[in-house]
From Swiss-Prot:
Organism: Nocardioides sp. (strain ATCC BAA-499 / JS614)
This protein's name: Aspartate 1-decarboxylase
EC number(s) per entry: 4.1.1.11
Subcellular location: Cytoplasm
Source organism phylogeny: Bacteria, Bacillati, Actinomycetota, Actinomycetes, Propionibacteriales
Gene field: panD
Reaction catalysed by this enzyme: L-aspartate + H(+) = beta-alanine + CO2
Amino acid sequence: MLRTMMKSKIHRATVTQADLHYVGSVTVDEDLLDAADLLPGELVHIVDIDNGARLETYTIAGERGSGVIGINGAAARLVHPGDLVILIAYGQMEDVEAKGFEPHVVFVDADNRVVSTGSDPADAPAGSGLLRGDRPAGR
């Protein structure tokens, strides 16, 4: 049986542009694609932290070092410049691989520069003001 597992996550990126009249996709700084082990054309889910919108699209490589997170096409009606988003990609794997698989988790700053990377999907980097995803609030 194949299991669908989270393989890559860029957490709390800031949308830098949105263009309704584009053919679709999300443009992502190539440095972020590399850090998250994402390829151009790869399916990603986008979760908008500000308004709760969820959508799926594919990645396009943006200029390396630019910090670009560009929402293109119809998704620009849901996600806007300045919104915080999470980009998530999933992979399918057999049980044995899934049990030992370590995803690529990337946290960025307000300019979409990498501040930490790891493999723990519940991690909340020190000083981020976030809570770990596997602990009750207040602990």
